[in-house]
Amino acid sequence: MADDNGFLKGPITRLFEKVARWIGLSINAGPVLAALFMESYDTGNRMCSDDICKATGYSRANAGLIISQLEALGVVEGRRDYDQTGRGRKRVLYAIDGTFGDIFNLGVMSLLDRLGAMMKDIQSIDDLRSGREDSLVPMLNDIRKVIQGRIESLEAVSSAEITR
């Protein structure tokens, strides 16, 4: 992957650091995402872990950990390079699996999961209270209303096409 213009050190890296945080990963995943996206758009090729290390400056262990996290989320797909000659284990070539919209929706789904967990907590509090009327009722109703509104908004966002 060519880095002739220093993109991985500047605004593109910062953008992908924010993307990494959006999907629940450390900002350290940002340069790996940037390298894979740039390679995808630049050449359409996959990258081996050595190429990712060279592009990001990360050690093999650090790059491997980040790649594993991205694979677990379904953001990155690895395939063995059967064109590689010689003995031994074939290297794995990595590429982004899906579109930027798919990755964006991972962040939305994460928020929906957290809001759903909050709704379950409210339901547990209601169940423990066993129908007692007290000062918690208005507070819980307000919280429930806000969370439900956010869930509906996020569901609309995740199903909408981004047109900007």
Task: Locate predicted features.
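Helix-turn-helix DNA-binding helix
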Residues: A63, I67-L70
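A short, conserved structural fragment
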Residues: E71-Y82
